[in-house]
Amino acid sequence: ITSQLGVLMRYCIRTVTWRFKESIELDPEFVNKRSVVIRSPSDVFENYQSLFKDQVRERFVVLWLNSANKVIGFEIITEGLLNSSLTHPREVFRGAIVSTSASIILAHNHPSGNPEPSQEDISITKQIVESGKIIGIPVHDHIIFADNNFTSLAERGLV
């Protein structure tokens, strides 16, 4: 079992490292964003809007935070269809666990330009929040990006 656990940990570390490098390549300003302290939904919007700019498909991203709410990394979990981005809690928390995140923030875009959360958005958020409670990694917010606007599900009492 010990050797199997070692293999699994090496796989997870390689996967997170690959995703992390992929994220940096997508956003060359990431080095500056890694030290961002998140105090409000607008901090997320201002610092990570470039991940969603000009996207024609939904993109679902998870920000990993330390105990001081400083971003220690992020991962693009899925890129979906024109109006949906399917994701599962295990994908959301895999990188957060390996990176020893204290908490996470979810973010995705609506290419339609409408920042209102859909029923699917609310449902998956609730599912991920409950999963986070079970494993001890709280979800602070779910931000929906749309053009030059955003909606915080936490501000609406949905997180």
Where are these regions (language model features)?
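Active-site-proximal loop/helix of nucleotide/amide-processing enzymes and allied scaffolds
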Residues: 1-26, 46, 66-68, 78, ...
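Long amphipathic N-terminal alpha/beta scaffold segment
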Residues: 16-76
